[in-house]
UniProtKB/Swiss-Prot annotation:
GO MF term list: carbohydrate binding; D-mannose binding; metal ion binding; toxin activity
Keywords: Calcium, Lectin, Manganese, Mannose-binding, Metal-binding, Toxin
Binding site for a carbohydrate: 12, 99-100, 227
InterPro entries: ConA-like_dom_sf (IPR013320), Lectin_LegA_CS (IPR000985), Lectin_legB_Mn/Ca_BS (IPR019825), Legume_lectin_dom (IPR001220), Leguminous_Lectin (IPR050258)
Gene3D superfamilies: 2.60.120.200
Extra information: Binds one manganese (or another transition metal) ion and one calcium ion. The metal ions are essential for the saccharide-binding and cell-agglutinating activities.
Function: D-mannose/D-glucose-binding lectin. Has anti-inflammatory activity in rats. Induces histamine release in mast cells from rat. Induces lymphocyte proliferation and IFNG production.
Name of this chain's protein: Lectin alpha chain
PTM per Swiss-Prot/TrEMBL: The beta and gamma chains are produced by partial proteolytic processing of the lectin alpha chain by an asparaginyl endopeptidase. Mixture of 60% alpha lectin and 40% of its beta and gamma proteolytic fragments.
Family per similarity comment: Belongs to the leguminous lectin family.
Organism: Cratylia argentea (Cratylia floribunda)
Tissue-level expression: Seed.
Length: 236
């Protein structure tokens, strides 16, 4: 199975798999059952911003999600990623819909990692920024229903004539692997930011967007749609 660390923006509470009974952001370590959550209210049709950071000295993964003029939701969890992730990983975005649906539109995405190694004076770093997405992106690995549209947006799940479709799952991963730790036990610090737009034609919306780090050959697990956000094969 894939090894996944994720931050979920969960728009539909699935209390049967440990979700709180409200919309929330959560930090997930190798399971859809979040290690830490905080209440979050999605604003239908508005552009929000998510910022994720990992401090390798404090060993703390944090996320903050906000809308312009609104309050922010913040969640953090203390975790030593070099005990969990392989040395090389890919970073990605994932989303799903189930019976209920929403658009899972990404307008921009950036990432910076810095791995300071003991063996050399210099730091290994990776940085990318998408302020828009090209029609046939060579620097993204698109999986499932993910696509880029003529407006320069990344649609993680299926949209037809501007309307979200049910039972859809899609992911986008940056093509270049990231070196997150090395054998001298030095772990990379990183920052990621993405802007997103979730909108729905229904009163009920589902299921959410996740930012994730995974082994480099990660693919969408069979049966991981809906509440599993395209990340995990089951709810364990």
């Amino acid at each position: 199975a894939d090894t996944i660390v994720a931050v979920e923006l969960d728009t539909y509470p699935n209390t049967d798999i440990g979700d709180p009974n409200y919309q929330h952001i959560g930090i997930n370590i190798k399971s859809i059952r979040s290690k830490a959550t905080t209440r979050w209210n999605v604003q239908d049709g508005k552009v929000g911003t998510a910022h994720i950071s990992y401090n390798s000295v404090a060993k703390r993964l944090s996320a903050i999600v906000s809308y312009p003029g609104g309050s922010s939701a913040t969640v953090s969890y203390d975790v030593d990623l070099n005990n969990i992730l392989p040395e090389w990983v890919r970073v990605g975005l994932s989303a799903s819909t189930g019976l209920y649906k929403e658009t899972n539109t990404i307008l921009s995405w950036s990432f910076t990692s810095k791995l300071k190694t003991n063996s050399t004076a210099d730091a290994q770093s990776l940085h990318f920024t998408f302020n828009q997405f090209s029609q046939n992106p060579k620097d993204l690995i698109l999986q499932g229903d993910a696509s880029t549209d003529s407006d320069g947006n990344l649609q993680l799940t299926r949209v037809s004539n501007g309307s979200p479709q049910s039972n859809s799952v899609g992911r986008a991963l940056y093509y270049a692997p990231v070196h997150v730790w090395d054998k001298s036990a030095v772990v990379a610090s990183f920052d990621a930011t993405f802007t997103f737009l979730i909108k729905s034609t229904d009163s009920d919306i589902a299921d959410g967007i996740a930012w994730f780090i995974a082994n480099t050959d990660s693919s969408i697990p069979h049966g991981s749609g809906g509440r599993l956000l395209g990340l995990f094969p089951d709810a364990n």
